[in-house]
Amino acid sequence: MAEAHITLSPKVTHEQQTDIDSECEITEVDDENVNENKSQEMIQDIPARDREEIENITRTFVELQENYRLIEKIGEGTFSSVYKAEDLHYGRYINDWDIQSEVLKESSFGKEKIPVNEDSRKPKYVAIKKIYATSSPARIYNELEILYLLRGSSVIAPLITALRNEDQVLVVLPYYEHTDFRQYYSTFSYRDMSIYFRCLFQAMQQTQTLGIIHRDIKPSNFLFDVRTKHGVLVDFGLAERYDGRQQSHSCRCTNSNAAELAHDFSIAQETSLGYIKNDTRPSKRANRAGTRGFRAPEVLFKCSSQSPKVDIWSAGVILLSFLTKRFPMFNSKDDVDALMEIACIFGKSEMRQCAALHGCTFETNVSTLTEKRVNFRKLILWASCGSASIYKEKLRHKPSQEERLCLDFLEKCLELDCNKRISAEEALDHDFLYLDNLAYEKKDDDTAFDNSFGETSFEKDEDLTAKHLSHILDFKEQEETDEPTSLSKRKRSIDEILPNDALQDGA
C-alpha cells in the first residue's frame, strides 16, 4: 500500500514567501549535501539499536526523508516511540502551532510575551511519534482525531501531520523545550506550583470542554519549561470521548443518592463478608487505562461510569509529589497494592465508603492501617522534613496563607468521591492557581486553620504511622518514559491516514 498523505495547512503565498526569504536570508546552495552530511554525523553519535530503528523508519517512509531529518530517540512507551527530528522545510509553511517563536513568560504582574531573538536559520525541530503496529486502527484513529480537535491551543500539543505506510503510522508533533520533572519538583515554591498547575488545569479544562478524558495525566506528559514557566499537555494515546448525557448508569456512583446508598451498602457488607460459591455473575468490566500510581480510586474499583474527574485525581497526585518531595508518590505493582497505598493515607473507613460507592467491598487485615485518614499537612511535613525535631518545630507554626490555599486545593483534587471532586473549570477559580498575582503578607496569617482532615496524629502514634506509611514514603526512582514533542508544519486528513475500511477491519 502506498503512503497516504494530504496536506491541510495552508502554504505560504508567493508574497509571504518573498518576505520570509528576505527576512531569513535563506540560501539553498548545496542544501542537500549539507543535510546529508549533518545526518551522517548525527547518526554516528546515537546507540546502534536506535540508529537501526531510525534507518528502518527512513527507508519505510520516503516522504519523511524529503521533509525531516531524524536525529535521535527521545522516548519510548508501551504503544509508541518518539524521535527528535529537524524540519527541513519549516519556512515554506505557515506554522501557527509554533508557540515557542514567542515565549510566554510568567511574572508576578501576569503574562508577558517575550520575543525570542533566535537566528532564523537555526534548525526547527519536531517530535515524530511512531505508533507500534500492535495498536489497533481504532486506537490510532481515536488519537489522531482527538489531536486534530484540540488544535489551536497554546497548552496542548497539536497534530502537525501524519504519515502511513501499510500498517506503520507516524505522527508529527511540535517539539517543546522542557525541564525534566525530577530536576525541579523538590525545589518548587508554592508560587511555582501555582503557575505549573494553572497551566496544567487550563489544558485539562480545554480537553474537558470538548468532552475528552486524557486518562494519562502525569509529569512526563506535561512538558514544563522552568525557564519560560510554560507547560504543554502531550500524549493522547489513551484519551477517550466522554458525554455526560450518555453516561452509563450501571454504577452506583451515578445515582443522585449515591452517598446514602454507599453508606447503607457498606453497613450491609459488614455482616455478609465472603465470596459466593460458584458465582455465575459476569465479571466487572471497565476502562482501567492509565499509569500506575496516578489512577483514580474509581478506576481501581472498575467503575463503569468514569468521568474527566479521573484526570483531576492524577493532577492531585502530582501536587502531592511536589509537597512531599517524593516521586513517584505511589509505586504499586497492581490494583490491589494501589488501593492499599491510597488506604494508608485515607484510612479504612473512607476506603470502605468509596468502594461501596462503586458497588465494591474494601476489607483488609493489615494491622498497620488506621480507620481514619492521615492529616494532609502532617503527612507532608513528615515526608519532607529531614528529622523528627524539624517536623515538630514546623508543626507548631501556623500555616501561611499560601500553604492553606495549597492544602485546600490538594484536598479538593484528592477527593475519594468522584462526585465531590473538583472539576477543571472549578479549579481555575481557586485562589491557589493565582498566587503569583496575589499579594501576601510575609508573616504568618493568624486565621485559624482547619486541621480536621482526620484524627490520626503523628504525636499520638508516630511509630505506627511511620510503619504503615514507610512502604510508600521510601521510594526508588521509577523509570518513566518522556514522550515529548517538537516543531513543524502540515496537517493531514485523518480519514486519509486511516480510511474507514482499515478502521472497520481493526474494530
UniProtKB/Swiss-Prot annotation:
Disulphide-bridged cysteine pairs: none
Keyword Cell division: yes
Binding-site list for ATP: I74, G75, E76, G77, T78, F79, S80, S81, V82, K129
Post-translational modification: Autophosphorylated. Phosphorylated by cds1 in vitro.
Catalytic residues of the enzyme: D216 (proton acceptor)
Result after altering S314I: Temperature-sensitive phenotype. Defects in DNA replication and checkpoint responses
InterPro entries documented for this protein: Kinase-like_dom_sf, Prot_kinase_dom, Ser/Thr_kinase_AS
Gene Ontology terms: cellular component: cytoplasm; Dbf4-dependent protein kinase complex; nucleus
UniProt-listed SMART domains: S_TKc
Presence of keyword Transcription: no
Activity regulation, per record: Phosphorylation of exogenous substrates activated by Dfp1.
Modified residues (Phosphothreonine): T291
Residues modified to Phosphoserine: S22, S493
An MF annotation (GO) of this entry: ATP binding
Major site of localization recorded for this protein: nucleus
Catalysed reactions, as listed in the record: L-seryl-[protein] + ATP = O-phospho-L-seryl-[protein] + ADP + H(+); L-threonyl-[protein] + ATP = O-phospho-L-threonyl-[protein] + ADP + H(+)
Keyword annotations: ATP-binding, Cell cycle, Cell division, Kinase, Nucleotide-binding, Nucleus, Phosphoprotein, Serine/threonine-protein kinase, Transferase
Any one GO BP annotation for this protein: mitotic intra-S DNA damage checkpoint signaling
Entry EC number(s): 2.7.11.1
Subcellular location: Nucleus
Stretch list, region Disordered: 475-507
Sequence similarity: Belongs to the protein kinase superfamily. Ser/Thr protein kinase family. CDC7 subfamily.
Assembly and binders: Heterodimer with the regulatory subunit him1/dfp1. May form homooligomeric complexes. Interacts with mcm10.
Biological role stated in the UniProt entry: Required for G1/S transition. Plays a role in DNA replication checkpoint signaling through regulating rad3 and cds1. Involved in the maintenance of mitotic chromosome structures during S phase through regulating the function of rad21. Required for initiation of mitotic DNA replication through phosphorylating mcm2/cdc19. Required for genome integrity.
Name of protein: Cell cycle serine/threonine-protein kinase hsk1
Organism placement in taxonomy: Eukaryota, Fungi, Dikarya, Ascomycota, Taphrinomycotina
